[in-house]
């Protein structure tokens, strides 16, 4: 929109300030501009002169601190909703991302709420690793003056369900904190549990926290609203797929696709480091197979979110069919009295193993039963979008977004099975076909603000994706900082993703160094962590020169092996013992010089 600027003589801003203000508000809608106006009014009224007129100084108010520790955005959304609820109740509240929280100040907190997800094998989200480490260290203070509550989000298909929340809850209590409420562990379908928990938190805090003055509520409540867009997880953009290109060789064991999606004139914005959320539909053939195995027709009416739909449509659009869980196996066994599955009930490890190796449709195939349509629906979990690290920068591709998709395919007793979202993009969306997408912002995986800062990128396999975006951005910015890429995959000839682009960046001098690890091209397997150790001396020089280190890819094995290699390099070339090296790497993480996007 165009904003009419008053004559310069009437402005209290100098030309430079005016230019910065105009640049910051160019893309805002009228609603957003109105919000900004209210925000600055709140800031103005937060000045000492204004505060003098309030009933009590803010310093005397035991404010509420909400710490949001999010990996995919769900925890952040719950935390923001709670913040809004508390502001509506006129309570003094501050919301802070775990990565921005100065954790040494935790001893001075009075009322603390933690909303956290879990990643990998029970680890906290990336932005909360430093806080988690601090609380579990010898440096953790006594917290006898804190009252706290924890809301934990997880996925029951994983063994360490909600482990991060369990960790925070038990440690805060161990350090002397008082539980406001018992911890809540929420599964993938977390919305109802979150809504009920938020109401209980507000009720519990009303009796403990004084009411805030309106001006204070405006200022403290709005600080963390950074990203605004008409499109979201719940209201995705209907975009179109323009390119679906296989970028692994004919003889590769992997099927990796370069996907380009046209955003049209939506003005949907993203930054390198963000993720693309993709809502997919299940394979109609898979739906038909499952329905027929249960002796159903597919046209039976079922209720989904208050709407009546045919069973086939509900299964294709609304329910998760490609990821089994221990809960589903246990419930199916109990419901059908399956002689094969009933012995697994109550055996957590066996249930987890069965769910991990047996898709839902094959569970039904191996243990057939007859269910009615509603019983089937009640057994399943809601379909959730998949997130892919964005592999492009809008500085180069403008109204497009690119992702790098490893297509999941495997056999179960002679039948080919595939991942829900990856096979949707690779096999079922035709050129110019519709794809529902949204941006999941990730401020914990960002290029350095200073373009002169060196960058070290470690991304084997499809973990290369965000570094393609990084390089496009650095090239467009003509950033003078050095760039070093570590990439690995099984074979040079079949699996060198975006090979021509990396070679061009090297030739142009944009990519300063590239180290490649091909795990199957020689007798002894070589991985990126081996290359890190091999280049330890030079790596330490880059770190000493202020380099930022980025890691993307598998959380369970690769990321841990890479971190161990980094610790060894720091210890050897930095002349540190193991404990000092660990402290050094933790400090890099706090300084945002060590960032990971792992999954």
UniProtKB/Swiss-Prot annotation:
Q: Which reaction does it catalyse?
A: hydrogen sulfide + 3 NADP(+) + 3 H2O = sulfite + 3 NADPH + 4 H(+)
Q: Does the keyword RNA-binding apply?
A: no
The residues that hold NADP(+) are 519-520, 525-529, 561
In terms of domain of life, where is this protein from?
A: Bacteria
In alphabetical order, the GO MF annotations are: flavin adenine dinucleotide binding; FMN binding; sulfite reductase (NADPH) activity
Q: Where along this sequence does the record place binding of FMN?
A: 70-75, 117-120, 153-162
Q: What class of enzyme is it?
A: oxidoreductase
InterPro entries on file: CysJ, CysJ-like_FAD-binding, CysJ_Proteobact, FAD-bd_FR_type, Flavdoxin-like, Flavodoxin/NO_synth, Flavoprot_Pyr_Nucl_cyt_Rdtase, Flavoprotein-like_sf
BP terms from Gene Ontology: cysteine biosynthetic process; hydrogen sulfide biosynthetic process; sulfate assimilation
Using the record's annotation, list all stretches that form the FAD-binding FR-type domain.
Answer: 234-448
Record flagged with keyword Electron transport: yes
Q: Which NCBIfam families match?
A: cysJ, PRK06214.1, PRK10953.1
Summarizing the function annotation, the protein's role is:
Component of the sulfite reductase complex that catalyzes the 6-electron reduction of sulfite to sulfide. This is one of several activities required for the biosynthesis of L-cysteine from sulfate. The flavoprotein component catalyzes the electron flow from NADPH -> FAD -> FMN to the hemoprotein component.
Q: Which HAMAP family match?
A: CysJ (MF_01541)
State whether it acts alone or in a complex, and with which partners, per the record. Alpha(8)-beta(8). The alpha component is a flavoprotein, the beta component is a hemoprotein.
Q: Which family does it belong to?
A: Belongs to the NADPH-dependent sulphite reductase flavoprotein subunit CysJ family.
Its name, as the record gives it, is Sulfite reductase [NADPH] flavoprotein alpha-component
To which species is this protein native? Shigella dysenteriae serotype 1 (strain Sd197)
- What gene name is listed for this protein? cysJ
């Amino acid at each position: 929109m165009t904003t009419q600027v008053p004559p310069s003589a009437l402005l209290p801003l100098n030309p430079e300030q005016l230019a910065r203000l105009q640049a910051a508000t160019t893309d805002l809608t009228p609603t957003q501009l109105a919000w900004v106006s209210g925000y600055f009014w709140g800031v103005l009224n937060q000045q000492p002169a204004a505060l003098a007129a309030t009933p009590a100084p803010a310093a005397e108010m035991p404010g509420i601190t909400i710490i949001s520790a999010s990996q995919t955005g769900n925890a952040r959304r719950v935390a923001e909703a709670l913040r809004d609820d508390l502001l509506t109740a006129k309570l003094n509240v501050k919301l802070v991302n775990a990565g921005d929280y100065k954790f040494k100040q935790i001893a001075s907190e009075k009322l603390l709420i933690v909303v956290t997800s879990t990643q990998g094998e029970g680890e906290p989200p990336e932005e909360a690793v430093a806080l988690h480490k601090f609380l579990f260290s010898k440096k953790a203070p006594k917290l006898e003056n804190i009252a706290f509550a924890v809301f934990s989000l997880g996925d029951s298909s994983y063994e360490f369900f909600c482990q991060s929340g369990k960790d925070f809850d038990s440690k805060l209590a161990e350090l002397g904190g008082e539980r406001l409420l018992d911890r809540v562990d929420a599964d993938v379908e977390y919305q109802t549990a979150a809504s009920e928990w938020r109401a209980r938190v507000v009720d519990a805090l009303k009796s403990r926290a004084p009411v805030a003055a309106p001006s204070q509520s405006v200022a403290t409540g709005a600080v963390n609203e950074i990203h605004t867009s008409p499109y979201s997880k719940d209201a995705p953009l209907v975009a179109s797929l323009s390119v679906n290109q296989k970028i692994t060789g004919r003889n590769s064991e992997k099927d990796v696709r370069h996907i380009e999606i046209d955003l049209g004139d939506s003005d949907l914005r993203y930054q390198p480091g963000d993720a693309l959320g993709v809502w997919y539909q299940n394979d109609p053939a898979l739906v038909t197979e499952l329905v027929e195995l249960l002796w159903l027709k597919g046209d039976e009416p079922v209720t989904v979110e208050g709407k009546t739909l045919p069973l086939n449509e509900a299964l294709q659009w609304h329910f998760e069919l490609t990821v089994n869980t221990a809960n589903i196996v246990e419930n199916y066994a109990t419901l059908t009295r399956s002689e094969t599955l009933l012995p697994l009930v109550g055996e957590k490890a066996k249930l987890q193993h069965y769910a991990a190796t047996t898709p839902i449709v094959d569970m039904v195939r191996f243990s057939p039963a007859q269910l009615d349509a509603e019983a089937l629906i009640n057994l399943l979990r809601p379909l959730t979008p998949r997130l892919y690290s964005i592999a492009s920068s809008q500085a180069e591709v403008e109204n497009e977004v690119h992702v790098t998709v490893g297509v999941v395919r495997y056999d179960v007793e002679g039948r080919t099975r595939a991942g829900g979202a990856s096979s949707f993009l690779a096999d079922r969306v035709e050129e110019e076909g519709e794809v529902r997408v949204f941006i999941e912002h990730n401020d914990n995986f960002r290029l350095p603000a200073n373009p002169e800062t060196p960058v070290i990128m470690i991304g084997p396999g499809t973990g290369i994706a965000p570094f393609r975006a990084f390089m496009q951005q650095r090239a467009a910015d003509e950033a003078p900082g050095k760039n070093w890429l570590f990439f690995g995959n099984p074979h040079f000839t079949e699996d060198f993703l975006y090979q021509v682009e990396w070679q061009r960046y090297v030739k142009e001098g944009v990519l300063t160094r590239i180290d490649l690890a091909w795990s199957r091209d020689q007798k002894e397997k070589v991985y990126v962590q081996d290359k890190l150790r091999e280049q330890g001396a030079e790596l330490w020089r880059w770190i000493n020169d202020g380099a930022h280190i980025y890691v993307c890819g598998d959380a369970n094995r690769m990321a841990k092996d890479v971190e161990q290699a980094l610790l060894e390099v720091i210890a050897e070339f930095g002349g540190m013992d193991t404990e000092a090296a660990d402290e050094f790497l933790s400090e890099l993480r706090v300084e945002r010089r060590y960032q990971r996007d792992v999954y």
